[in-house]
């Protein structure tokens, strides 16, 4: 719903949350259905390669994934917040511990991965002593460390590049996505002088989402656009069109799976060169198809 047609800020936010617009006395749904993927049989795949990539949210082109706002003209969330909200409200159900999508995560496991509660020893001692502690006092003894959008600096994606025999074109299908952030428990690690001990650069995969299960949520979430606050580009559009910058860190082409850093250790420049080599190898698949 546009702010230009709104009677009040509260009504604007209310109808946005419902994915509806009010025209006269009628409410009209503006919910988007994601564009359906074409059905592809294994026999129609001539060549394929599965790749894992990292999207650095510090890069300018990737900022739309990071932007979190609750403005009137445009109300947007970061991709991480969208995924987390979808997981918590049950609209995204396919959530796993890693990119192999074997071990599902429970809501409690997801909460443990994104939130850490530290209880002061003094509180435990008072409880064990049988003292009654008010809610106000309790807050003084409890610290909650939570992974928020500003703490998620990178995303991981897993997808397949393939050539469809029916049209001989190189295509891409996104399979999974993960948010990377610090282990929230590391925020609570303090030295004798109160200095943080957690490694600021150490990021973990908070959770992996099987992408097809998240499409309906992402197809109804608008991406922040600083050139046009009324833009209707969705996260599903952005990801499927590959409008981002990324680095390949792992690939699988039928001969095995390998993390680049494992077979090219301790050499960042050589790892970047290998990532580019794999990108070129993907592009050459289509040329090889025509020369076959």
Describe each region flagged by the PLM:
Residues 194-258:
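A recognition module on extended beta-rich or small alphabeta surfaces enriched in W/G with H and D/E
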Residues 136-170, 182-223:
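Short helix-loop boundary/capping segments
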Residues 1-144:
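N-terminal Sec/ER secretory leader and immediately downstream segment
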Residues 56, 96-97, 106, 148, ...:
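Short, solvent-exposed coil/turn linker segments
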């Amino acid at each position: 719903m546009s702010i230009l047609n709104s009677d009040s800020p509260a009504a604007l936010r209310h109808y946005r949350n419902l994915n509806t617009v009010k025209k006269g006395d009628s409410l009209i749904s503006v919910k988007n259905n994601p564009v359906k993927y074409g059905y592809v049989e294994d026999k129609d795949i001539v060549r394929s390669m599965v790749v894992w990539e990292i999207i650095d949210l510090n890069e300018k082109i990737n900022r739309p994934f990071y932007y979190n706002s609750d403005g009137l003209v445009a109300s947007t969330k970061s991709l991480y917040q969208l995924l987390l909200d979808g997981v918590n409200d049950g609209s995204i159900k396919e959530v796993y511990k890693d990119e192999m999508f074997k071990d599902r995560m429970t809501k409690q496991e997801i909460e443990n991965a994104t939130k850490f509660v530290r209880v002061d020893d003094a509180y435990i001692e008072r409880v064990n002593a049988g003292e009654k502690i008010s809610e106000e006092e309790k807050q003084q003894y409890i610290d909650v460390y939570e992974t928020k959008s500003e703490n998620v600096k990178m995303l991981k994606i897993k997808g397949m590049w393939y050539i469809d025999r029916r049209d001989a074109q190189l295509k891409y299908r996104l399979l999974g996505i993960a948010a990377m952030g610090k282990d929230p428990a590391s925020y609570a690690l303090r030295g004798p002088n109160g200095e943080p001990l957690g490694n600021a650069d150490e990021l973990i995969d908070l959770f992996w989402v099987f992408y097809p299960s998240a499409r309906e949520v992402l197809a109804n979430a608008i991406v922040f656009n600083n050139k046009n606050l009324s833009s209707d580009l969705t996260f599903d559009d952005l990801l499927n069109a590959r409008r981002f910058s990324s680095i390949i860190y792992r690939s699988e082409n039928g001969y095995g799976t390998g993390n680049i850093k494992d077979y090219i250790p301790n050499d960042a420049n050589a790892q970047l060169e290998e990532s580019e080599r794999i990108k070129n190898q993907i592009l050459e698949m289509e040329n090889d198809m025509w020369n076959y």
